[in-house]
């Protein structure tokens, strides 16, 4: 029996009344853009796309050539379809409505065009993360303020990981599903329906070089992980860290674990490293739809009411029981 394609999957979701035609079209166009990005990434040095672009983004980060190219691909692909009202990107200062010459739709698209791009030059897996919201009714030209909706309002979220194979991992609010790009056919085929994150784990993903900057609750939590079976947790833990959120979260969706990017004192003015709207929210939706959990260490990420388009948050996501344990350390410390 042949595997269902992404196109068939989306049509069946529409027939079941779970999505409408506009959302189906939007996801289809995003997936096509991801194929183009996958081709560009796979060419590497041969495509002349590696290295710095010589520009910076609103985050103050140096842009890679592939950051800029991936952003342009997503903007161009989604401009003319009539399904989108506006889009926002990690690489742009402000949101961008669809051009006046094209029809406007009902949805808002947010994306990190190439997460983990600092790893591009060393051939580590990178990816595209995206989130879909509904545009508020009666809005002719959506601006930044119309994107400021809590993650619970997402109607779809996903990422495309460019690794040994290219995979699109998607949720429409009814489970998390993985599709693998069949390059000869040019189609994404369903390879894992209803992914499930194990409730318990013995793996954690964190950048330990920042340990000296963590708050006491975080120090205590990781200290107990490092103590292993001789410590309070009573079992040994392994650490995994790729420094590409898409790659680390993909591993967790596949076999469990907890991904952690906590607040630290390196820049106390920033509440976290990762961006809420186009990193934390879509990844949290994917993980929760797979039976996992996602918090800031103190509150559920999807419940946060955003106040800024490029807002940052601490992130703890993955296996439900381990996320609850990490959160408990922080909440207990707050009560002390």
From Swiss-Prot:
InterPro entries to which the protein is assigned, alphabetical: FBPase_C_dom (IPR044015), FBPase_class-1 (IPR000146), FBPase_N (IPR033391), FBPtase (IPR028343)
Cofactor note as given: Binds 2 magnesium ions per subunit.
Keyword Hydrolase: yes
SUPFAM superfamilies in alphabetical order: Carbohydrate phosphatase
Subcellular location: Cytoplasm
Keywords from the named record: Carbohydrate metabolism, Cytoplasm, Hydrolase, Magnesium, Metal-binding
Positions contributing to Mg(2+) 1 binding: 90, 112, 114
Chief location: cytoplasm
EC class of the enzyme, as a word: hydrolase
Positions that bind Mg(2+) 2: 112, 115, 279
Pathway: Carbohydrate biosynthesis; gluconeogenesis
GO biological process: fructose 1,6-bisphosphate metabolic process; fructose 6-phosphate metabolic process; fructose metabolic process; gluconeogenesis; sucrose biosynthetic process
GO cellular component: cytosol
Catalytic reactions on record: beta-D-fructose 1,6-bisphosphate + H2O = beta-D-fructose 6-phosphate + phosphate
GO molecular function: fructose 1,6-bisphosphate 1-phosphatase activity; magnesium ion binding
EC number: 3.1.3.11
Residues that coordinate or bind substrate: 115-118, 207, 273
PANTHER family listed in its UniProt record: FRUCTOSE-1,6-BISPHOSPHATASE-RELATED (PTHR11556), SEDOHEPTULOSE-1,7-BISPHOSPHATASE, CHLOROPLASTIC (PTHR11556:SF35)
Assembly and oligomerization: Homotetramer.
Family according to the record: Belongs to the FBPase class 1 family.
Protein name listed in UniProt: Fructose-1,6-bisphosphatase class 1
